[in-house]
């Protein structure tokens, strides 16, 4: 039952994003990313706890911020001119788009904080 409620909420947010930004939200694979036309989130495991739900919503907020604030043309041009340096640009861009998202949508900060805490805990578990 819990996963169905979360999936329902996620679908509602996805519909809002589609209406507002014209993007599609799908869950597949094990990474979160966007190309500006669609947002891909990791597949949803069962069962999910509250921390994992917040992490998925944090991913959605982060990728939504890319859709709202990234200039994909500039990113593509940079990648063409500076192959191998895309990760450096992405780090700077992530900080900028997340700051703008937190200013525009106040609830985003809590979701990003939860996402980073979950990622940090998973990385610590690998050490």
Tell me what each language-model feature is:
Residues 1-127:
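Basic/hydrophobic alpha-helical interface regions
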């Amino acid at each position: 039952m819990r996963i169905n409620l979360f999936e329902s909420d996620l679908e509602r947010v996805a519909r809002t994003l589609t209406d507002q930004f014209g993007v599609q939200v799908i869950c597949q694979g094990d990474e979160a990313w966007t190309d500006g036309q669609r947002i891909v989130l990791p597949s949803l495991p069962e069962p999910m706890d509250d921390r994992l739900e917040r992490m998925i919503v944090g991913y959605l907020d982060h990728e939504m911020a890319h859709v709202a604030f990234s200039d994909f043309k500039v990113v593509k041009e940079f990648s063409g001119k500076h192959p191998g340096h895309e990760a450096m640009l992405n780090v700077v861009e992530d900080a900028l788009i997340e700051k703008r998202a937190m200013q525009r949508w106040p609830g985003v900060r809590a979701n990003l904080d939860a996402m980073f805490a979950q990622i940090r805990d998973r990385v610590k578990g690998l050490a």
